[in-house]
Design a protein with these regions (language model features):
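A short alpha-helical cap/connector motif
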Residues: 1-166
Length: 166
């Protein structure tokens, strides 16, 4: 799984940043969108985002104009690590998601856990799946098992900040 982890996570080459220091998450994300735009020729592209939290990545996906449909799976409950770090409640997180995504009509929120809604998505129907939900090994592995069949042939899967312990 360690080799698979490196393959599925978007690890852009450092030289792409042009030596610019700053928010590497943002730079990496915009670089990923640039590459996705080249790799997904379908103008009717569809994606699933597992774990949307406050909708910041969702907003960037929607702003990219790559995806006609973005399906977000977010229960707005669960791991408390970030909420405790930044003193947020889940209601505040959900409200921020709504604020961040309010101007986009191509976003559908599925307010639930991925294991409860995975059967709502057809197999071989999605161009891109982005996994950023629960970050422990078993949860990521289960998301991969449940959602890999949802990808079209030559579809792309990516993710963000999976657990460092594996």
């Amino acid at each position: 799984m360690k080799g698979l982890k490196r393959t599925l996570r978007f690890n852009y080459p450092r030289e792409w940043s042009g030596g610019v220091k700053g928010n590497q998450y943002f730079l990496g994300f915009t670089d990923m969108l640039y590459e996705l735009n080249k790799m997904i020729p379908n103008t009717n592209a569809r994606m699933i985002e597992i774990g949307s939290y406050m909708g910041e990545s969702t907003m960037m996906f929607a702003s990219s104009d790559i995806f006609q449909e973005i399906h977000c799976i977010e229960p707005f409950t669960g791991e408390e690590e970030f909420n405790q770090m930044y003193n947020y409640t889940w209601d505040e997180v959900e409200n921020e998601f709504k604020i961040n995504t309010r101007f986009f009509d191509n976003i559908t929120l599925h307010k639930d856990f991925s294991y409860n809604v995975n059967n709502n998505f057809d197999d071989n129907d999605y161009d891109f799946i982005y996994i950023d939900g629960a970050h422990d090994y078993n949860s990521v592995l289960n998301d991969l098992k449940m959602f890999l069949p949802k990808l079209k042939q030559n579809g792309i899967i990516g993710g963000h900040d999976w657990g460092h312990e594996w």
